[in-house]
């Protein structure tokens, strides 16, 4: 009996396919299906396979998410209703006080994520040193690329789109050769101080290896310290001949300097120039541009240097200060006028001298008398 009744019901049911055009099912529209069925009575004894279209169940049973009213009012179902807020204090929300992520947070998120990978192990050196505190421009050595079994520290730098490794263990005693001397003018116009007295002795073992790594250190330091225009103060005083850099080393430095650094160099001040440095620059003219030669300026004293640049942050080595003092002392002695010879008065001459002159005069008179 139940099967026959279900069959009669199905003949009058308008079946609508809800799965043809959409991926997700949607509830059937509420229509008056009960009236067309003539007010069918619910049969509680019907098997689960029958289609129950009684008045109590007018829609197809679907699983849907709970409805949430995403609004800022306190209506029922809203995010600000009592169902979601625990205390009345939580209801006092100012939209202007809501913090939104900025660019810094985004960068921190990217930096901590796994999507970004280093192409190499090149560390980034930060120029946080204050002017003059550049004995080790790359830090205290704790962030080196690695250390070999013999305890050497290495630094990887990129110069001219080429990767180089610097042996910091070998050049650590000579790192004071280049320091930051502050700024001049307006903006970040840096003063780079190069003290030749801190260069290694040519008779030291591994001299060429040290100079090779020291050269890379100087070039990479310039790229770290220079932001805009800059000048180089070359302290040549108190530097013995055995510590003077060779022509080949200077030539290599010039060619390895980036074009931006060469262009932004406004002046090369050579303090206490010697005949050797003048000769080196004269020999180097064929491979040095005319513009670079025009930027060279000779300064013969620290007093003259002080009139050109601010000296607040320029660290002068003790040997350079002593050399300046010796030059000033020698200059004062050379310009001192000669003292006149002291002549004794006639009355203070010795009596023997007077007697000898009297005897000579008497002998002359006797000769004249005898001749007459």
Curated annotation (Swiss-Prot):
Region span, Mediates interaction with GLS: 190-372
Disease connection: Defects in Atcay are the cause of jittery phenotype, which is characterized by severe truncal and limb ataxia and death due to starvation and dehydration by 3-4 weeks of age.
Region feature Required for interaction with KLC1, mapped onto this chain: 115-120
Regions of compositional bias (Polar residues) in chain numbering: 43-53
Protein's UniProt name: Caytaxin
Upper taxonomic lineage: Eukaryota, Metazoa, Chordata, Craniata, Vertebrata
Tissue: Neuronal tissues specific. Strongly expressed in brain. Expressed in virtually all parts of the adult brain, including cortex, cerebellum and olfactory bulbs. Enriched in hippocampus, cerebellar cortex, deep cerebellar nuclei, and pontine nuclei (at protein level).
Chain's role: Functions in the development of neural tissues, particularly the postnatal maturation of the cerebellar cortex. May play a role in neurotransmission through regulation of glutaminase/GLS, an enzyme responsible for the production in neurons of the glutamate neurotransmitter. Alternatively, may regulate the localization of mitochondria within axons and dendrites.
Comment, domains: The CRAL-TRIO domain is known to bind small hydrophobic molecules.
Extent of Acidic residues compositional bias: 354-372
Region (Disordered): 1-58, 329-372
UniProt source species: Mus musculus (Mouse)
Sorted UniProt keywords: Cell projection, Cytoplasm, Mitochondrion, Neurogenesis, Phosphoprotein, Synapse, Transport, Ubl conjugation
UniProt-annotated location(s): Cell projection, Axon; Cell projection, Dendrite; Presynapse; Mitochondrion
Compositional bias (Basic and acidic residues): 11-29
PTM comment: Cleaved by CASP3 and CASP7. The potential C-terminal product released by CASP3 cleavage may inhibit the ERK signaling pathway through MAP2K2. May be ubiquitinated by STUB1.
Modified residues (Phosphoserine): 54
Cellular component, GO annotation: axon; cytoplasm; dendrite; growth cone; mitochondrial membrane; neuron projection; neuron projection terminus; perinuclear region of cytoplasm
Annotated CRAL-TRIO domain residues: 171-328
